[in-house]
Amino acid sequence: MRKYVLTVVSLCFAATLWGQTPAGSEWTPQVQQAAAMIKDNPTAASEAFGELLKGKNKKNTELLVAIGRAYLEQGKKEEAAEYAQRAKDINGKYAQAYLLSGDVALALNDANKASSDYNQAIYLDENCNEAYLKYASVYKGVDPQLSLDMLMRLQTKAPDDIRVNKELGDVYYTMGQYGKAKEAYEAYLKVGKPTEQDYTRYAMLLYLNKNYDQSVNIVKKGLTMAPDNHVLKRLAMYNDLELKAYDAGLEAAAVFFSNPNNPDFVYLDYVYFARLLEATKQYDEALAQFNKALTMDKEHPDIYKEISEVYEKQQNYPQAIASYKDYLGALKGEPEVSDLFLFGRLNYYAATDSAYRDKQPEFIAEADTIFAQVATKVPDNYLGNFWRARVNSLRDPETTQGLAKPYYEAALAILTQKADASKSILVECNSYLGYYYFVKEDYPQSKIYWNKILEIDPGNETATKALQGIK
């Protein structure tokens, strides 16, 4: 029901545009004169309409509908409904009477009756294009497939009606079929006269289809027509970020946020602004904008993750880790393995930073625990064991205890089964094991690993020198 009400509200304005008084009728000037009195002198207007309907016009259904529409345009729904009914009583097969009746129903928030009346108008006159369009609009936000079916019927019957492609674009947009929506709008804009709303919708469709260059051009055209259009100013900023035009994006952001009290800002606006600031290394300002986004909407855990990334770029690892923990805690359900991996790697990088040497044991322990979970969750992937090996190398920098040995061996066992294994990773695993056995003075075993490296990378200087030293 709520969707129907929203649809009705959006259509009330369209109803008046799609059903104007027929031009050229001999009584059109009198209707317009009387209509001008409806608001300020309804009695005089009623009397004037009554005079028009005397004599030969007593049963003029076209005139009755024109009068009814004049009342509807002034918000007089009851009077409009009365004239629509009078027209139907005189000629129950007059499609325009049902079209007006449908418009009145829309104004009264009765979408079911409106769609029924529009359908009846189509049944009575298959060339009543407005009825197809209005029926499609009623269902656009409720059952878009019904809208689509009706519009396709109209397009087959009236391929030159430029309004069809515009409405198809709106329906496809509602259905999330942005590629088709873009094509429909392109077809419309080639022959139609775009409005501010058309430019806005088309620019959005281009953005959603990742046609950022094209979207930029449409945004510029739209802003020429409507320089205060909030959505177009938003898209200017969004497009520039996607195109990596960061300076232009910051200029667009300054324009977009020039009125800080605008109630139409959404959390994503602050996220995009923050990303622009981050891209230009204005990290403190970026953090402030990310936090504004969180204040506005805490239902998007990825914001915590982006905050963590900014802190990491500042090498503020304690804050980066704290923000990442906030991210993991805000997730609904268990974190993905990729999330755990990135958290483990963050702790590893913190452990390698000499500025936090006093916290190194804490970071190492956290990283080791997390990478152990990764190895357990995806046993066929080398990453968990490989990064555990790196972490334990920090615990045993001289390789005297061989703390990393079992993890490099486990990673190597997986990697050797993969034809596309990274050469650099294979070299690292074999290098550690070669050096470990060298320290243990087990030279034959050490040579095995150094030779494996030369099989992978014949020009590897470290392996060559190690073998020369053993000889």
Model-derived features: positions:
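Alpha-solenoid helical repeat scaffolds
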Residues: 5, 13, 20-440, 462-471
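Alpha-helical oligomerization segments
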Residues: 447-448, 455-469
